A protein has these predicted regions:
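Membrane-interface alpha-helices at helix entry/exit sites of multi-pass transporters
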Residues: 64, 101, 139-149, 197-207, ...
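Short, small-residue-biased leader/transition segments that mark boundaries at the very start
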Residues: 1-5
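N-terminal alpha-helical transmembrane segments of multi-pass membrane transport
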Residues: 11-145, 261, 284, 502-508, ...
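Membrane-embedded translocation segments of transport machinery
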Residues: 197, 201-356, 363, 368-421, ...
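Helix-loop-helix module between adjacent transmembrane segments
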Residues: 17-20, 24-27, 31-41, 74-79, ...
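Membrane-water interface regions at transmembrane-helix termini and the short interhelical loops
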Residues: 15-19, 44-58, 77-96, 149-156, ...
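Long, low-complexity, intrinsically disordered cytosolic termini of multi-pass membrane proteins
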Residues: 518-543
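Flexible loop linkers connecting adjacent transmembrane helices
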Residues: 15-16, 49-55, 82-101, 126-151, ...
């Protein structure tokens, strides 16, 4: 009786302690977001200047670190996909995937970087054409700079970007669905630090994951708000001022909170499918009315250049000349942005990938979304470069001055421009809604101890905070403030991503090795122990 009573009291104490820690993580995370929002809203100019200084310092000193870590993630995931560990399911061995393949791909893409690719799909390749990624070596406004522009844009939206999402999503899905643990990043670090590692450290990791996720989505929403504002001004002469941005944000928050009420399976799935339809309509339109031969050839050549220069671009720094400004402005920003958003993608991708094998997960995430991005870039970005090569100075000057109107200015050169531009605005808006909707669900769960289905009040609170900080930073410093938010949170979280590799490998080695039996040679082996235990036995036998 005493033992039962002791265990009961111990369980009650553990539950109370867990509740206190969850409340601590929740409260501190909310306070940090509120403070940043207030500072950006009350002191926008000072915030913008400070953001610029911090961004320059971090990218100057730690740009190399972002490049190395992302390259390591690339190599590790490729190894994992084709290793024996790829057979494990993200769930029980008998479990079937929850979503169909088409719905799974659509949810990955639209909730991942849908708004980003629409924003940069025209602006980035055209900007690289105007301002060469290799200043002094390749002339601006040249055919060679056009070729490099497409290849480099493919690199920024290719495997490297999605490998960051994949590692975070993979480890969360593995622990949550195969090991029946919560979906917190701190829990996924247990194989590295041990299950009993100190609670303050766990709390710090969880708080950092929440802040990073909010900052990452704020960057994406901010880009979307800027582009919608630019599109409305370009089409209908709506003033592109702070008041317009606030109205766009209020409408967005109202819609994605309404979508959250329908639940993840209904709201996000329906909106994701609508995104695919609208995006496909615009892409087919540009393929029909654009130069299809040029688009297909530029796509093919860009794939070739991407594969040929993958390692060079992945680890490109200029220590001898000392000028890394272009790399810091583009590659480092992209990696930091994606890293800061990876806790969200980790949680969301884990949620929709239950029942799939590690191999299926890695191959799907590293191949399908990048190919979709490449197709969009070749269609819209390639068409923009074709117009620029034909000396369309109006498009060049407008995009060089304002990224936000790049897509709309391109569409204005084709029939039905008002219709297609309006569809583009709707597409961007829905991309924002799906991303914010999914993030609200994931962040609310992270802030409440890894809950898969957080309560409505928590989702409403985090939805309001995400909307507020997005518009506050957009107004305070525009693109630079948004970039700084990603870089600041992405730096410490990049170290956590690196540790996740060791965490996942240690966990996989503890799996029963009957999964690894491949030939009759293995018949005499004992499959009742884990691979880690088998290796220890082999070492003892060798001694």
């Amino acid at each position: 009786f005493r033992r039962v009573l002791f265990r009961s009291n111990k369980n009650i104490k553990m539950k109370n302690k867990r509740k206190i820690n969850n409340t601590l993580v929740y409260t501190i995370s909310v306070l940090i977001i509120v403070v940043i929002t207030l500072i950006a809203g009350i002191f926008p100019k000072a915030f913008g200047m400070y953001a610029q200084s911090v961004y320059d310092w971090i990218t100057n000193w730690f740009g190399w670190l972002f490049l190395i870590i992302v390259f390591i993630l690339d190599v590790f995931l490729i190894f994992l996909a084709f290793s024996r560990y790829g057979r494990f399911k993200l769930g029980s061995d008998e479990e079937k995937p929850e979503f169909s393949m088409l719905s799974w791909i659509g949810m990955l893409f639209s909730a991942g970087l849908g708004v980003g690719i629409v924003f940069w799909g025209v602006a980035e390749p055209l900007t690289h054409y105007l301002h060469s990624p290799f200043p002094g070596k390749i002339a601006d406004h040249s055919e060679e700079s056009a070729r490099v522009a497409m290849g480099y844009t493919f690199f920024h939206w290719g495997i490297s970007q999605w490998s960051i999402f994949a590692i975070s999503g993979l480890i969360v899905a593995y622990f949550q669905f195969r090991k029946q643990r919560n979906g917190l990043i701190s829990t996924a670090m247990e194989p590295v630090f041990g299950e009993a590692y100190k609670r303050p450290f766990r709390n710090i990791i969880d708080i950092l994951a929440i802040i990073a996720t909010v900052m990452g989505i704020a960057t994406s929403i901010g880009l979307g708000i800027m582009q919608i504002g630019g599109g409305l001004n370009h089409l209908f002469d709506v003033p592109n001022n702070n008041f317009t941005k606030i109205l766009i944000t209020i409408l967005m928050v109202a819609i994605f909170l309404g979508s959250s009420l329908t639940g993840l399976n209904h709201g996000v799935k329906w909106l994701s499918n609508l995104n695919i339809l609208l995006g496909a309509i615009l892409l087919i339109f540009i393929l029909i009315f654009g130069d299809l031969k040029f688009i297909l050839e530029s796509y093919t050549l860009a794939i070739s250049d991407y594969l040929q220069h993958f390692i060079e671009y992945s680890l490109r720094v200029n220590p001898y000349s000392g000028d890394d400004s272009w790399i810091q402005q583009w590659t480092v920003f992209y990696w930091a942005w994606v890293i800061s958003w990876s806790p969200f993608i980790g949680g969301f991708v884990a949620r929709v990938s239950r029942g799939r094998t590690i191999r299926e997960f890695v191959v799907g995430v590293l191949i399908i979304p990048p190919l979709i991005s490449f197709t969009w870039i070749a269609g819209f970005g390639g068409t923009a470069i074709k117009l620029a090569l034909n000396h369309n100075d109006k498009l060049v000057h407008i995009v060089d001055k304002d990224y936000t109107v790049a897509l709309f200015e391109l569409l204005s050169h084709f029939p039905l421009s008002e219709v297609t531009s309006s569809l583009a605005i709707v597409l961007i808006f829905i991309f924002i809604v799906t991303s914010a909707d999914s993030t609200t669900h994931i962040v609310a769960g992270m802030a409440t101890g890894g809950s898969i289905n957080p309560t409505l009040k928590h989702k409403v609170l985090w939805g309001l905070l995400i909307g507020a900080i997005s518009v506050a930073m957009t107004i305070a410093g525009g693109l630079k403030s948004l970039q700084t938010a990603s870089v600041i949170t992405g730096l410490p979280f990049s170290i956590i991503l690196l540790l996740m590799i060791f965490s996942l490998m240690r966990a996989l080695k503890r799996e029963p090795i009957h999964h690894f039996k491949m030939t009759s040679i293995d018949d005499e082996k004992d499959y009742s122990i884990s691979l880690e235990e088998r290796e220890k036995q082999d070492e003892q036998d060798n001694k």
